[in-house]
Amino acid sequence: MQAMLTGDGLEVGTTVVLQQQPAYLKTADPMPMLRPADLVSPDEIGQVVGLRAADLVAVRFRRGTFLLERSQLRLAQT
C-alpha cells in the first residue's frame, strides 16, 4: 500500500497520540456511532489507518478505530 503524504506529516501508518481529549469519540465504522471519550487514554499511541475529507483522520487505538480531527492529534515520539 502506498503511503499518502500530507503537509503536516500525517500519513497512513504514522503513530500519533491525542493532543486534547475530545468530548466523545466517533467510530470509523461504515455506520459511525458516538462512544465515550474514556475509551482512549491521553497517552495511548494509535496508528493512522486512513485519511478522510474535512481534516478527519481514522486512527486505530487498542479499543477501536475512531475518526478524529487533525487538530486533536500530534505525532508520537519514537
Language-model-detected regions and their locations in the chain:
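Basic/aromatic-rich interaction segments and small domains that mediate binding to polyanionic partners
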Residues: 2-78
